[in-house]
Every structure is written in C-alpha cells, then in structure tokens.
Amino acid sequence: MVIDRKNLFIGSSLRTNKYSIEKTADILFKQKVVERVTLIEIPKHPNCIHLDTLFTQISKTDFVYYQPFMSTGLKITQYRGDLDHQVTYSGIHQLMYEIQPMVRLIPCGNAKYPYAEREQYASGCNFVALKNSVAVSYARNLKTLEALKERGYQIISAGELLNGIKTGLIDPEKLQDTIVTVRSSELTRAGGGPHCLTLPLVRE
C-alpha cells in the first residue's frame, strides 16, 4: 500500500510472508523507489487476508481502519533505506502520527458494537481513492459511512455521481470530501472490496 512518495506499507498475513516482504523491500531500496518500507504483521485470521481488509487510505490525512485489530498488539517493523536499519512501533497510531501529524483514523462501523465486526467482514475498511479525499466504498456498510459523514464527507451513489457529471451539476475536478458508494450484493459473494478490485498503475 503506497502511503506517499516515501512510504510503502505491506501486511504480513496468511497470504504474504515476511521473507517475501523483505526481498521486495531490498529490491525497492536498491532501485531507490521508496525510502521506507513498513511491515505490519496483521492477525492470522480468515477475515484479514491482506492489509486492505483492515486499513485503507482515502485522503492524504484520512484512513479507515478496523479498531479491534489495529489499535494494539500489532508487531510493526519499519525498514529505513535498507534491511539493517529498523524501527519498531507499538501500534498503528504511533506509526501514522509520525508519518502524518494531521492524520485522522476513522473506525470501521463507527466503532460501534456489533457493527464494526460485521462491516469489517463486509469490506468496510476496503476503500479505493480516486483522488485526494474522494473514494469508493460499498453502500452496505452504513455505520462506516456514518462515521465518514460525521467527519465532513458527503455520501453519494455512483449513479448520482454519473448523472451529476452528465448534467453538469458535478464537476469531477472540483469534487472533494466525497465517498462514492457502489452496490455490492454480487461483488461480495467472492469476497473483497473496491480496493481489492482495482490495480492503480500510475499515481501522483
């Protein structure tokens, strides 16, 4: 997960092991692609296949995360420039505040029981950013959308967005602080969310 020009996060999970991450980091450092690679050892749990099932970025400062798994007890190792220079962190908060002092960590399910667990299972943390502060989410995760609305985001459906662009009521270049929702009844049958379904090839 590319956080910014300097930082890359990779989750070590049931599907991604530490050896592969360190080999990747070594190649990236030698080619001077990034300055820091952060290895986050996420729980070995079937609901946590990859890092983006627990944590995704929607703006330069805002991230949606699953609080029960990401707040405490994580083993986080950051490699700085090479594999010999390492820094460890006690949790995602400590790590993120160092990278981005203005960070806002927005809880999946609005940190409400039992919605947080249900919505994490339904890809409630899994957003894909179209641009800074404009991201796509499943429409079904209502409490997560509620948390975003409370923090100043407007929620519109993909249909509303497309109609607004077509009629000239919405200028996509000026769009900001917006979550675009898509229906998920068929997509969720195979698992994964909007971030899982995309592969950015070029990012600013």
Regions found by a protein language model. Name each.
Residues 1-204:
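The feature marks the mature, well-folded catalytic cores of soluble enzymes
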